[in-house]
Regions:
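Conserved beta-strand segments of the P-loop GTPase G domain that flank and frequently precede/overlap
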Residues: 35, 76-78, 104-106, 129-134, ...
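Conserved C-terminal guanine-recognition region of P-loop GTPase G domains, centered on the G4
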Residues: 140-152
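Switch I (G2) and immediately adjacent beta-strands of P-loop GTPase domains
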Residues: 61-81, 96
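Switch II (G3) loop of P-loop NTPases
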Residues: 77-82, 92-119
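Inter-motif core of Ras-like GTPase G domains
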Residues: 115-136
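Beta-strand-loop-alpha "switch" segments that mediate conformational coupling across diverse proteins
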Residues: 160-221, 227
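Walker A/P-loop NTP-binding active-site region of P-loop NTPases
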Residues: 2-61, 102, 107
Length: 232
């Protein structure tokens, strides 16, 4: 199962934090690889801190590291810097799909048409696209797309506090998007991810912070993980 994250041109949606959280949860069930395809190396920093090279952009196979933390079985393809040969990374991902049961591709915000084209080899490999969006008009407009016939799971994420009325409004917007997508014969689901201040403190030395997230957050992430593990 290959999942690619997508937030359109909008950064700051909490996409990487959510990709890390889901990967940690899924790794308790199946062999998991989180591929950090962003120039900033956000997923790498969350799970491994200042990881040394070689990085994904230089040598995909040698970029694989295991997260050495109690109870975790997740691997990370570490990265720093922009990918210069996305096709080579895509070939590596195809090979890794035979070794890992679940791959999460953390793709950065795609700020222009050139960026979309550059990362298309990774998006094409995905069985499911995880759209991470916020309850605000700019984020919704930037991210609610379909990808051919690929399954879409939308996470309406609150990386900062939002009024319930606002969240409820955009939940209805996303519900309508999923309904219209289903009418086209494309599988679409959505999950509401509530704001949780503990998640912002996640880091390689603070994995135990996940023991202090709210029941609502934990339940939402578990539901998201369950949807992503579903074949169709």
């Amino acid at each position: 199962m290959i999942v690619a994250t997508f937030s359109g041109s909008k950064g700051g949606t909490g996409k990487t934090t959510l990709a890390v959280s889901v990967s940690v949860v899924v790794s308790a069930l199946v062999s998991t690889l989180l591929v950090d395809a962003s120039a900033e190396g956000g997923a790498t920093a969350y799970l491994l801190g200042d990881a040394p090279p070689p990085y994904l952009r230089e040598d995909p196979e040698r970029s694989l590291r295991r997260v050495e933390a109690e109870g975790l079985r997740v691997f990370v393809a570490v990265n720093r810097g922009a990918l210069t040969n996305v096709e080579a990374v895509a070939r590596a991902v195809e090979g890794w799909a035979a070794r890992f049961e679940f791959l999460m591709l953390d793709i950065p915000a795609l700020t222009d048409v050139d960026a979309v084209e550059r990362y298309m080899p990774l998006l094409r490999l995905a069985d499911t696209v995880l759209v991470v969006t916020e309850p605000n008009p700019a984020s919704i407009e930037a991210s609610l797309y379909t990808f051919g016939g690929k399954r879409v799971v939308v996470a309406l994420n609150s990386p900062r506090p939002y009024p319930k009325t606002i969240v409820d409004h955009y939940a209805r917007v996303i519900s309508g998007f999923c309904r219209r997508t289903l009418e086209k014969g494309i599988t679409a689901d959505y999950v509401l991810i509530p704001y949780d201040p503990a998640v912002s403190r996640l880091g390689p030395s603070t994995f135990k912070v996940l023991n202090y997230t709210s029941e609502q957050f934990d339940s939402a992430v578990m539901r998201l993980a369950s949807l992503l593990l579903r074949k169709k």
